[in-house]
Amino acid sequence: MGVLDIAKGMGVTLGKLFQKPLTVSYPEQRATLQPRFRGRHVLTRHPDTGLEKCIGCSLCAAACPAYAIYVEAAENDPRDPVSPGERYAKVYEINMLRCIFCGLCEEACPTGAVVLGNEFEMADYRSRDFVYGKEDMLVGVTGSRPQRREALSAGRPVRLGFQVEGGPRAELEGVEYP
């Protein structure tokens, strides 16, 4: 190893010194999320009726490779329906410690009820707090309270799910995109 090799290494180091840093001073600065980012799961409602979109079919649980989703279905009462189908999800739980955020549950859902949102700050102290129930995940078409608060401070609409090109997917009709 000669002096020339050391000079080359120092040249690379000095070159990087004057470039813009790649790191972000989180939480003071926030990096922009990519359009296909998959964060915390949310269960959506129909924009017109306010009924839950989840019909309790358990396809999301069957598609989950990490076995993180548990769905228990019940018959829907025609006088006071919870969802537009014959059944609804009486129990919907997801263990976020097991979830690998692959998005297969979102793809498997025939009604578009399961959406991977853009929330990623899910820190907590107890492991049992990472098992989200239906009440923790159910949001309207305007998003959850933290999503609305963040969107309001950023001056942009709430974004649920992702969109590659074109208009919103039919299952997410009524959900606003950036």
UniProtKB/Swiss-Prot annotation:
GO molecular function: 4 iron, 4 sulfur cluster binding; iron ion binding; NADH:ubiquinone reductase (non-electrogenic) activity; quinone binding
Cofactor list: [4Fe-4S] cluster
GO biological process: aerobic respiration
Boundaries of every 4Fe-4S ferredoxin-type domain copy: 45-74, 90-119
SUPFAM superfamilies linked: 4Fe-4S ferredoxins
Pfam families documented for this protein: Fer4_7
Regions that span the bilayer: none
Amino acids binding [4Fe-4S] cluster 1: 54, 57, 60, 109
EC number: 7.1.1.-
Family listed: Belongs to the complex I 23 kDa subunit family.
Free-text function comment from the UniProt entry: NDH-1 shuttles electrons from NADH, via FMN and iron-sulfur (Fe-S) centers, to quinones in the respiratory chain. The immediate electron acceptor for the enzyme in this species is believed to be ubiquinone. Couples the redox reaction to proton translocation (for every two electrons transferred, four hydrogen ions are translocated across the cytoplasmic membrane), and thus conserves the redox energy in a proton gradient.
Stated name of the protein: NADH-quinone oxidoreductase subunit I
Source organism of the structure: Deinococcus radiodurans (strain ATCC 13939 / DSM 20539 / JCM 16871 / CCUG 27074 / LMG 4051 / NBRC 15346 / NCIMB 9279 / VKM B-1422 / R1)
Origin organism lineage: Bacteria, Thermotogati, Deinococcota, Deinococci, Deinococcales
Gene: nuoI
